[in-house]
Amino acid sequence: MSEAPVLEDGFEFPGQSFSVAKADQVRKLTCSGIDPAIYGEAVDVAMLGLPTLRVLMACGLPILGGVHLSQRFRQKHAFLLEEEITISGRILEIAPHPRGCILKCAFEYARQDGTVCVEAVRSGISPIGPKEPSNGIPRPSEELDGFGEISR
């Protein structure tokens, strides 16, 4: 059994590949009251959330007991359903918190040719590390540049 990696600022998560199955996206969108036809053959960027959590879990980061603080996706190009996607990421910052630490990470989602289609920054309270007082939880920027509604 291998030793858990030392997690610190700059740590790079091992890359993983996955694809979003059309049936999964249709089921989840329908369950949420969203017409899957809005996305056609494109992947809804929200479908990238679970694979991101899998990257964290593969490095021994507990998901249970964590508190999601923020997540922002920047989509440059749409992925197609069933297309192979490679995710890579790194830790930007680890800050103390009474419940463990505030973990801020950046991720890139790329096509097989290396084209980065989506970038994400997420933060959350993770129940790891010394439980120390914090200087407050930093709020993400509320800048809305680049946001647009998908036509319905």
Language model: regions and residue ranges:
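HotDog/MaoC-like acyl-thioester-processing domains
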Residues: M1, H77-R152
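Hot-dog-fold acyl-thioester-processing enzymes
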Residues: M1-S70, K131-R152
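Short helix-to-loop capping/linker segments positioned immediately adjacent to catalytic or ligand/cofactor-binding
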Residues: P36-Y39, Q75, A95
